[in-house]
């Protein structure tokens, strides 16, 4: 491993950088799991054995390890492939094995280093859906590294954008799109489909009452506009989880937010 030059990594009050080799080994076994870009499966082991590998490292008995691994094999949609070897699986299926292996250890932190980058677009979207569905239930801390901004905006609750090793902006997808920190970020996000990323909560006006179709706070602007068009209305009501009106949104504001900011003919404004 390459030793970091500076900084700290604090997990539950403990500085990972100050841990001994044995402490790091224990941290890796019990608190963190990883999903690799190139799958990292053991070619001579079956799907079931690969998924159970981390459990065996933790010292869990074969019977319990097999039972727990089977649960995650089922959850990622690989039931029936338990005795297959990695070479018999497609890339997407191999990555499902990798995800199941990481989840089987029940680690608090999941590190995913460009985990879906090697997959074709359709399978990549499918894996994103699987991850998001599982996260709805598991609520893990997931550190997802990607060069694909669309992927980051879709998956991330909090996003950090780096340039030359430095964090340029950190925030939720809505704030990054609505309030880019500098010219570099503005150029970085300029081709994003704002209508799919931005949600009504980012542009709504607070209101206790509003007319028109009702929509949830996380409704994408693209869908909100379609609802307004279908209803033949210029504005709609934004409702919270309890169904009560908390704001309103107008067609004009939605269209304005979806439009890419006009930069004219100037080129990048950063060095």
Identify the role of each PLM range.
Residues 12-15, 52, 56-59, 63-81:
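Conserved ABC ATPase "signature" region
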Residues 16-33, 57, 62-63, 180:
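ABC ATPase NBD coupling module
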Residues 211-241, 250-271:
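The conserved cystathionine-beta-synthase
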